[in-house]
Amino acid sequence: MLNILVTGGGGQLSLAIAEAAENTADNYTILSHAELDICDHKAVESMLRSKEIDVVVNCAAYTNVERAEEDMDVYRINRDAVAGLSTLCKRYKTTLLHISTDYVFGGDTTRNTPYLEDDPTAPINNYGLSKAEGEEAVVANGGIVIRTSWLYSPWGNNFVRTIIGLTTTEPTLKVVDDQRGTPTSALTLARMIVGLIERRQILHMSGIYHYTDRGEATWYEFACEIARICNASCTITACSSTDRPTRAKRPAYSVLSKRRICTFDEIILTDWKVALAECITRIKQN
C-alpha cells in the first residue's frame, strides 16, 4: 500500500482524484490549502515525514490567469512553493507528480501542430511563466510534470458550468473562435493519474508528460457542444479575441501531443465530446 498526498484539496482535480481513488487499496490524504499550504516549507516537510508519504500529487496552484497579470503571488505559489516542494520530495525520496498547463506555450504564433513534451516553452502571460518556471524545478529534482488543458469538472467554477448557466439566462452569447486547444475533463485526468499509481508506473516515471482528452476545439466550438448536449435554445456566435480583450494574453494554439503518455498500453484517451457528455450528465444529476 502506498501513502498518497494530494494537495489543493477542494479543487476540481483533487475532488475527481478522491472519487477515482475510492475503491483503491492505497491510502489517500487529500488536503486543502487551509489544511496544508504548500508555501509553508516546514509544514510540508512535517507532513512528508509524519505520514511517510510515497507519492505527492500537487494540484495546488494559483490559477486566476487574469489576476496573475497584477498579483505577483502567482510566482510565490506556482514557482517558489513548487521548487521547495520538489526539493523536499527529492530529499525524502518521495515521488512528485506536479500538474501543469498548456499555457506554458503560446509564444509561437504560427504553431498549428500539437506541442511535444520537449518543445521549448514560450509563455505569454504571468500565469504561464510561473508554471513554466515551476516545471523546471520539478524536472531538475527528478519529479514528474503532467501538463493538461482547458480543465473542467462537475464542480466549482469552470467553462462548462459557466456556459450552462449562461445558456439558461441569456438569449445570445459571443464566444471567441480564434483560440484552439483541447477541453479536458477532470474525471478522465483523475482516472489516468490514479491508474498510474495503482499500476505503480508512477514510481518509474520522470520528466514531462501531456494528458488531455482526444481531439481539439476552439472555445466557440466547445460552447456550441455544451449547448447542443444541454438542448439549449441560446444562440451562440463566434467572435475574435480582439472583440473580447483581456489583461492576460491567451495562446492562439495550445493543443498538446500525448505521444509520451500513450506509450503506456493502459492509457486510452477519451474523445473530448464523450467526456463532456459524461460531465454534463453528472452536473444535471446534482
Q: Which role fits each region the language model picked out?
A:
Residues 22, 27-44:
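Adenosine-cofactor binding site in Rossmann-like domains, unifying the SAM/SAH pocket
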Residues 208, 218-224, 239-279, 283-286:
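Conserved C-terminal active-site "lid" loop/helix of NAD(P)H-dependent oxidoreductases
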Residues 69-97:
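NAD(P)-cofactor binding segment of oxidoreductase domains
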Residues 76, 80-84, 104-105, 109-146, ...:
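Catalytic helix-loop patch of NAD(P)-dependent Rossmann-fold dehydrogenases
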Residues 192, 199-245:
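Mid/C-terminal beta-alpha module of Rossmann-like enzyme folds, strongest
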Residues 2-21:
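N-terminal Rossmann NAD(P)H-binding glycine-rich loop of SDR-like oxidoreductase domains
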Residues 136-181, 187-188, 194-195:
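NAD(P)-dependent short-chain dehydrogenase/reductase
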Residues 38-79:
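NAD(P)H-binding glycine-rich loop region in Rossmannoid oxidoreductase-like domains
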